[in-house]
C-alpha cells in the first residue's frame, strides 16, 4: 500500500481529515526547505504539498506567485526540488510528499525522466495544475507505473464528464478547488462546498482534499467535517515570506500549523 493510501485508511479509521500544508520549494531560502518540511511534520502535518516553482503560475494568487519568483531568482530548478525530497526521505519515510506545479518544467525534463527521478527521491503524488485529465492520460500512466499518484483537480464548474475522467485517470486523492479563481482568494460558501464534496465522494471512490481560501483554524475545522484532507497554502506562504532567517521561518511554520493540526484532530469527519 502506498504512503498516501495508507494515510487515508489510517485517518478514515480515526474519523478525521488530513492536514496538508503547502510550501514553495526554495522559499524563503534554499537552506530552509528541508528543515521546514520536518517542522511541518513536527507541527502536525499529515502530508506535505511542495510547490515546484514556475515562472507563470496562472492558477496561483499573489502570495504563491511571489514565492515562486523568489525561489526562481535563487536559482531553484526542478532537480533541486527532487533532491530536497530525497534529503527529507533520509530521516522521514512515512509522511507523504505531493509535488504541485505546472507541466512546462516537467515536459522540459521529460515525463519519464521526471517520474523516475521523483520515484527515486520518494515523491508520492504529483499535481500538475495545467494538465487536464483528458490531456494527461499518458503522463498519468507513466507516473502510476512508477508508484506515483497522478492527482487531478476538480472545481465547482466541473461537469459529469470531467468527474468521470478524473475517476478513471486519477489516484491518491482528488483536489477540489473550493473557489472559482486563484489561490489565496477570500472566502467560499463552505456549506455549498461541503455539499458538493459529499456528492463527489459518492461518484469518485477516491479521497477528496479541499483547497483554496483556507486560512485559519476555524475554517480548517469547518472544512474537516466533510473533506478527507484540508490544504492550506497561501496563508502559510505569507507567514514564511515575512521571515528574515531560516530559524524564524521554522518557528513561524510551527506556530502557524499547530492550531490547524489541532483543528483537524478535534473535528470528527461526517461519514468517516
Swiss-Prot record:
Catalytic machinery residues: 49, 60
Superkingdom of the source species: Bacteria
Pfam family, one: Trp_syntA
InterPro entries, A to Z: Aldolase_TIM, RibuloseP-bd_barrel, Trp_synthase_alpha_AS, Trp_synthase_suA
Reaction equation(s) it catalyzes: (1S,2R)-1-C-(indol-3-yl)glycerol 3-phosphate + L-serine = D-glyceraldehyde 3-phosphate + L-tryptophan + H2O
GO molecular function: tryptophan synthase activity
Record GO cellular component, one term: cytosol
This protein's UniProt keywords: Amino-acid biosynthesis, Aromatic amino acid biosynthesis, Lyase, Tryptophan biosynthesis
Entry's EC annotation: 4.2.1.20
Pathway entry: Amino-acid biosynthesis; L-tryptophan biosynthesis; L-tryptophan from chorismate: step 5/5
Subunit structure: Tetramer of two alpha and two beta chains.
Functional description taken from the UniProt entry: The alpha subunit is responsible for the aldol cleavage of indoleglycerol phosphate to indole and glyceraldehyde 3-phosphate.
Protein family per UniProt: Belongs to the TrpA family.
Protein name (Swiss-Prot/TrEMBL): Tryptophan synthase alpha chain
